[in-house]
Regions:
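Hydrophobic face of amphipathic alpha-helices that form TPR/SEL1-like repeat modules
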Residues: 42-49, 76-83, 110-119, 147-155, ...
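Short helix-capping/linker turns of helical repeat alpha-solenoids
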Residues: 37, 67-70, 83-85, 104-107, ...
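Terminal, low-structured helical/coil segments at or just beyond the last alpha-helical repeat
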Residues: 27-33, 464-529
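Structural signature of tandem alpha-helical TPR/SEL1-like repeats
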Residues: 52-57, 88-97, 121-132, 159-169, ...
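Canonical positions in the second alpha-helix
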Residues: 64-65, 100-101, 135-136, 172-173, ...
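N-terminal leader/linker segments that initiate helical-solenoid repeat arrays
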Residues: 21-68, 72-79, 111, 516-529
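Bacterial N-terminal signal peptides
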Residues: 10-20
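Alpha-helical adaptor scaffolds
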Residues: 395-429
């Protein structure tokens, strides 16, 4: 665990990093607002008109009904203000209408109100969401319990993420028949949400089996995949193939991906793997399409056929797959000085991948804008895309953005505080160059108080993460440490690797933000661009 005296870049940025959930499970992502549900009774006409896209007319029809206390109409007006459709966007007015609808026991209003309150930076408002959801859970434990589980796992209702309470609420929701909560439990025990100490492959398998038995086709494919390629202690080829067959019969074609993955990575039979990927590709399964493209591009078990591979990537890209767009962009932009046609074409594919929320693509697009290869450097666009990738948890983007803030570029002055925080966030994900950069700042006392003990620990960690140039810094700092400090530095390194929070010290200075736990890095890492 690293504690640094760097100010937060912004509440939004820190929140995005300090809650390392790999995928949203109930709470809406970003500002996403789904369409309201179908209404019955007096508000039906207003709701139908609104869902047809005539938002202003829907608001007009709902207003007099809302004044009479109609819960459906109140909910619709709340949604309109939250989304800015048909009226002004206003979180305050959305909350006002949702509260009134919630008082009339409107379930969706309770949940939308809770989403807004949970996103608040005020603890009091988040606690209001907790109370509303716990009350709703008495009648609707499935949905309310699922949302509460995620809120606790994200640390929105407690000072730190609380996996025990998350599991409690998900189990309660699951017992009420909520298949999504069953799947969340399966993923949780698989370690997808962090907390490796609570990982339990057998419990994960139990929950995947439960969801599959209840008819969830995605769970059928996931279960089959785990039985074929998961932890060796739980593998069962016969049962795995049976579940994948059921998934395919139910038109869940990701099962072909699981079969291909099993043949490729467990059985080491590349021809059999390609056959499964081809079947999935023919059924329209995008991931199988990408795997098949890889086989032809790399000549794995077949004669190398770049044209066929690229054609498959283009087909996947046309279907909107961001990874396919990114791979084509990489092909077109690979040259040091790509031709104009390739540059423009690559830019288009890269932009599509970035708009598809692929952090790697967002990072590369940001760098492309900053490079000036498009004719002139666009600092604003470059920083915007790097920031978006950084908010998505991309360690390379965090490091790149930190470097920009540390050095400063035209149109963007230096900001050591931002740089330090971003380096820390990237280092917490095991990023070697960021770890070294952070060690350098800490040693030199740039933006923070010089701390040779912490600097030695960080520099040593950077060496372990493949940064050979960190050796010189380790040696230099070591010459400044006395015996007592060397012992403290070793302890600091051990603490960083363990992920435990350091012991608190009496310090009259303003408390520094606590970054996520440092993860031990591999002995070697790939070179960073």
């Amino acid at each position: 665990m690293i504690r640094m005296h760097f100010r937060l870049i912004s509440t939004l940025l820190f929140t995005a990093f300090s809650i390392p959930l790999q995928a949203a499970v109930s709470l809406p992502a970003g500002n996403a607002v789904s369409m309201p549900t179908t209404a019955e009774g007096p508000a039906k006409a207003a709701m139908d008109v609104f869902k047809e896209g005539r938002h202003a007319k829907g608001v007009e029809l709902a207003t007099p009904l809302a004044e009479q206390g109609n819960a459906e109409a109140l909910y619709l007006l709340g949604f309109a203000h939250e989304s800015g459709q048909g009226t002004e966007a206003s979180k305050e007015k959305a909350l006002e209408y949702y509260r009134k609808a919630a008082a009339g026991k409107h379930k969706d209003a309770i949940y939308r109100m809770s989403f807004i309150l949970l996103a608040s930076d005020k603890e009091e408002e988040r606690d209001q969401a907790r109370q509303a959801l716990e009350t709703a859970a008495k009648d609707d434990p499935a949905v309310a319990g699922r949302i509460l589980g995620e809120a606790y796992l994200r640390g929105l209702l407690t000072p730190a993420p609380d996996p025990d309470k998350a599991v409690f609420w998900w189990e309660r929701a699951a017992s009420d028949g909520d298949i999504l909560s069953v799947l969340l439990l399966a993923r949780f025990y698989e370690g997808q949400f962090g907390f490796p100490e609570l990982k339990d492959p057998k419990l994960s398998l139990v929950n995947y089996t439960k969801a599959a038995t209840l008819g969830n086709t995605g769970a059928m494919a996931a279960l089959g995949s785990r039985l074929l390629s998961g932890d060796e202690k739980i593998r069962d080829e016969k049962k795995g193939r049976e579940w994948l067959k059921k998934a395919i019969e139910a038109k869940e074609y990701s099962a072909y991906l699981a079969l291909g993955d099993y043949e490729e990575n467990v059985k080491k039979d590349l021809k059999a793997a390609l056959a499964e990927y081809e079947r999935g590709k023919d059924a329209g399964q995008i991931d199988c399409m990408l795997r098949t493209a890889d086989f032809y591009l790399e000549g794995k078990s077949v004669e190398k056929d770049a044209d066929r591979g690229i054609a498959l990537l283009r087909k996947a890209a046309e279907a909107g797959n961001p990874i396919a767009n990114f791979r084509i962009a990489a092909q077109l932009l690979a040259a040091e000085k790509p031709e104009v046609a390739n540059l423009l074409g690559g830019y288009g594919y890269l932009l599509a991948a970035a708009n598809g929320n692929l952090p790697d693509a967002q990072n590369e697009l940001g760098l492309l804008y900053l490079s000036g290869k498009m004719g002139v450097a666009d600092t604003s666009a470059g920083i915007a895309w790097l920031t978006r990738a950084a908010q998505g948890g991309n360690a390379q983007a965090q490091n790149n953005l930190a470097t920009v803030y540390e050095r400063g570029i035209t149109g963007l002055p230096r900001n050591i505080e931002n740089a330090g925080q971003l380096y820390a966030l990237a280092a917490n994900q095991g990023h070697g160059p960021a770890t070294l950069a952070l060690a350098r700042l800490v040693y030199q006392g740039v933006g923070t108080k010089s701390d040779p003990i912490k600097a030695w620990a960080l520099a040593t960690l950077a060496v372990e993460r493949g940064q050979k140039e960190a050796d010189a810094l380790v040696t230099e700092v070591a010459t400044k440490l006395d015996e007592k400090q060397r012992v403290a530095a070793l302890k600091e390194l051990e603490t960083m690797k363990s992920g435990k929070a350091p012991e608190k010290k009496d310090d009259a200075s303003v408390p520094a933000p606590t970054a996520p736990a440092i993860a031990p890095g591999p002995k070697k890492v790939k070179p960073v661009k």
